[in-house]
C-alpha cells in the first residue's frame, strides 16, 4: 500500500510542479523504461515503429506526422487482429507501446498514468516496480532538466 500511495503522491507532484507538456514528457520517459522489458511481447511487425517513437522523443529527427502515421498503423493492427476491444491481457504490450506515439498529452496526466497503471499488471509489473521507475524518471528529469 505504501508503493501505491507514493505513486499517487508523485503523480500529484507532476501535476502541481510541471506544465502539462513537461509532465507528459516525464510520462513518456517512464513508458520508455518498460519497452526493453516488454518488447518481446510486441509483434515484430510493430516493433519497427518503436524507432519512430525513439526518433521523435530522443533524437528529434522524426516529425509529428510520422509519429501519427505510426500510431495509426498500430491502431489498425489492433483493429485487424480483433484486439481493439479485446481483454487487456491479450493486447497490453501493444497498447502500452501505443502510448509513445502521441506527440502531446491528449488528456490530463492522471488519465495517462491511470491507463498505464491499468496495463502494467497485465504485463507482470507490480506497484513496487512502477514506483521505482517513476521515481527514477522524475529524478532524471529534474537532474537533466528535460522537463523542468
Show which residues each predicted segment covers.
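Structured binding/interaction patches within domain cores
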Residues: 1-148
Amino acid at each position: 500500500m505504501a508503493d501505491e500511495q507514493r505513486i499517487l503522491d508523485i503523480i500529484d507532484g507532476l501535476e502541481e510542479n510541471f506544465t502539462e507538456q513537461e509532465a507528459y514528457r516525464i510520462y513518456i520517459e517512464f513508458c520508455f523504461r518498460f519497452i526493453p522489458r516488454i518488447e518481446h511481447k510486441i509483434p515484430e511487425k510493430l516493433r519497427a515503429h518503436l524507432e519512430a517513437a525513439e526518433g521523435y522523443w530522443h533524437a528529434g529527427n522524426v516529425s509529428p506526422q510520422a509519429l501519427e502515421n505510426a500510431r495509426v498503423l498500430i491502431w489498425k493492427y489492433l483493429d485487424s487482429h480483433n484486439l481493439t476491444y479485446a481483454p487487456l491481457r491479450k493486447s497490453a504490450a501493444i497498447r502500452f507501446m501505443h502510448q509513445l506515439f502521441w506527440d502531446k498529452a491528449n488528456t490530463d496526466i492522471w488519465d495517462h498514468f491511470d491507463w498505464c497503471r491499468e496495463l502494467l499488471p497485465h504485463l507482470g509489473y507490480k506497484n513496487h516496480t512502477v514506483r521505482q521507475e517513476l521515481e527514477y524518471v522524475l529524478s532524471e528529469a529534474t537532474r537533466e532538466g528535460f522537463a523542468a
